[in-house]
């Protein structure tokens, strides 16, 4: 009973929800064998023909290349591309590619030389002698990708499966209308396909290998059964024709009864799926040593006179293939890359064939029908009934139209396979698939921006953390350097600080020399000043013999004598037994220098200007004022009360001054006035000003 149940389950197939049955339109192209197309004069090979990043260029403009020569290097998910024929690289530049908007992508442009020479090919006929890793690396470096439409790198897919794969499924359903590339390939190359399947099974080591094919391909089924007649490791499952039974999740459910979870992959349930065209490319890469440089493309539609399936070199312009098929375009001719439900119209025909190009449909106007106006959704739920992914297309439509990305994501818009079944059954002619494609593109753009922002935030936070660590390390170093010394070192440090403070205090105090202290130079300084005063008095008393001066000035002599006598008395008092007040030698030196400079200046001015007439009365008054100021300075300069003035000396001095004044008046009245000595007058005035300033400074010092 258990064996009977196992046998029943072995051949059992399941069904999936939804699906439609559109006209197949396959007989236009599946009746003729595969044929070759003449080489195009120029090939455009986009660097990115797969899911993932483009490879690194390894050719330059002007290089000569051979068929099968690598144009890029593949690392990780970067799949290399190869030259489709021999020729010369004439440009490496952006070119419009197979995209609904014909976006420009970096491409290598090759001018064919017509020789179509291959590189040296090295096949592994005994592939079982090579390791799993070596086989995967060879498949990857030979540019094999999923040829069923997704374009995922086959080597990466095999590497990611690992030991989790229990079921290998070969997708031979080819459910979309018009497309017969896989059907014709199975009819003409069934043995090579089965050999490629065995290579995949050798790499994955699954428990079972299943081939799923729709029952509308009787010739292909017959060819596969003939090849698999003696095989027990591969099972052929014929399934009912229903669109989209060729979808990966749908075919998995049909053959195994398992459903791929939302947001998951088929490998999560132990299933890995490959297309029959991919299996054929694996065989050519491993056994024949040929990179993928061509694929089968269906040329169909009522606008071509020779529909069929051809071996199209990758990079061949679409226009070249259609012209070979007898393309007769109408006024508003449309050319669709892919099928009528999942394909997209080409903006122009200069785009190249790539690895995921399986069909070029050129329908007539009557074949496609007139475009109908889009109307409002009537919420009939026909789209939900037809959806094979169990989604709610009408809700996704509202979310997409309203830019409600969060709600669209919550309703699993990412699980939409864009099969077009919802748009096919919509009575309002709403292009639902276009809305869903745009919404998924916007969500992907938002996620990419969020990823970039998160990476930038992570970099910023890492930098901040690094700066904080460096700051903490600096603080720790400073703290360790500022550790208090031991107790035995405290006394030495305190003594050193005391010495430093004492030196600073001594440096800030003015240098003052007290009388009687050692060394005491006050007496010497006073004697020197007295001698200088006596010399000046004698010089003033005896006129200088000069040819330009006729005689002395009695008024000036009187003034200078009085000043000299006052200074002499001051010097006597300072040189006496009483202690003298402190003398600041720096101030004395400064004042003496100022006096000498002013005297020299006055002499220079007196020598250049004419002397003014001298008034004897004014001279007497000035002499008296000078004597009074001198006595006042003596009183202020002393630290004790001023000594009493000798009246006799004062009387004598006054009498002498009066006599000199009368004599000068008489001489001035009886004889013509002689010209005054300008130099002596200037010197006397300078001395008077200096002494007055000195007295004022001394008074300020005493007050302080």
UniProtKB/Swiss-Prot annotation:
Cofactor requirements of the protein:
[4Fe-4S] cluster
EC numbers for this chain: 7.-.-.-
Tree of life domain: Bacteria
Q: Where in the cell is it found?
A: Cell inner membrane
Q: How does it sit in the membrane?
A: Peripheral membrane protein
Cofactor binding comment, as recorded = Binds 2 [4Fe-4S] clusters per subunit.
Q: How does it assemble?
A: The complex is composed of six subunits: RsxA, RsxB, RsxC, RsxD, RsxE and RsxG.
Report what the protein is called: Ion-translocating oxidoreductase complex subunit C
* Taxonomic lineage: Bacteria, Pseudomonadati, Pseudomonadota, Gammaproteobacteria, Enterobacterales
Q: Gene name on record?
A: rsxC
